[in-house]
UniProtKB/Swiss-Prot annotation:
<dbReference type="Pfam" id="PF12937">
    <property type="entry name" value="F-box-like"/>
</dbReference>
<feature type="region of interest" description="Disordered">
    <location>
        <begin position="1"/>
        <end position="29"/>
    </location>
</feature>
<feature type="domain" description="F-box">
    <location>
        <begin position="206"/>
        <end position="252"/>
    </location>
</feature>
<feature type="compositionally biased region" description="Polar residues">
    <location>
        <begin position="1"/>
        <end position="15"/>
    </location>
</feature>
<protein>
    <recommendedName>
        <fullName>Putative F-box protein At1g23770</fullName>
    </recommendedName>
</protein>
<dbReference type="InterPro" id="IPR036047">
    <property type="entry name" value="F-box-like_dom_sf"/>
</dbReference>
<dbReference type="InterPro" id="IPR001810">
    <property type="entry name" value="F-box_dom"/>
</dbReference>
Amino acid sequence: MDTGFADSNNDSSPGEGSKRGNSGIEGPVPMDVELAAAKSKRLSEPFFLKNVLLEKSGDTSDLTALALSVHAVMLESGFVLLDHGSDKFSFSKKLLSVSLRYTLPELITRKDTNTVESVTVRFQNIGPRLVVYGTLGGSCKRVHMTSLDKSRFLPVIDLVVDTLKFEKQGSSSYYREVFMLWRMVKDELVIPLLIGLCDKAGLESPPCLMLLPTELKLKILELLPGVSIGYMACVCTEMRYLASDNDLWEHKCLEEGKGCLWKLYTGDVDWKRKFASFWRRKRLDLLARRNPPIKKSNPRFPTLFPDRRDRREPFDRFGPSDFYRFGLRDPRDRFGPRDPRDPHFYGFRY
């Protein structure tokens, strides 16, 4: 494994603690004190990230800072680190890739960590971005990936480490960037790995939408707009089956199309198709109101007295074809457009 560590410790246990089980995070200030000092629920993730950075960082390289940020999300989600030989993370600035192995505390039942079901997280240093790949058991059959912009997240991570500076200068944009980093890593990498590892090891899956009862999932779909239900149908096969319920789409038609005469439809009606037609018409009407068509005058009966709001001359309303058809000439142009059938069309008349 191409991981660089500093300050090796031979007495370390095979797994690093997590927030889910035995945390094992022994910083200068306990986590409960940090959270109490935060005085706000929104600071839980930034202060947990700060604890991990202060405790595990062995250098100030960009790869170490971003890798520890991903490591903090893994710990918060319940993972523990395998095969670590040190309490400090220290990655060389010239290092292009790093791999780490994680597992769950419930799976550590033997001293031989090579036989434990695990996930592999690989960090690829590519120019201004750090690409993080996650695989189940090191297999490349299904790869989960997220990409982190260094110029976007590194200043926020540096600010999180300096608690006093973060509290004084930390505006809503800094908090938003911290939670954006946390959500990107958790949604795109950590949660899929956690679900896959639990399914492979026979453990109970983490709380998620698909584990809810069918009646509750249908109730959630009823509260969504019709367009959002269409998006939910693209999530998985089960959600597509639930979103195809005919009674659900009848309810959406009556709810969103109150001005339509839905009661005229009798018998077996495909309400999903009716809602799709209604939504297309509604969208076209909205576009028509935003971009009204230009009112054109009748070329056979030109307006002698133009509208005061329209400062153009009457002849300006005609196009080239109108000049050719009626033999008209632009009064401002001595040699205006003529009929192509005119023998003097390509030269002067005089």
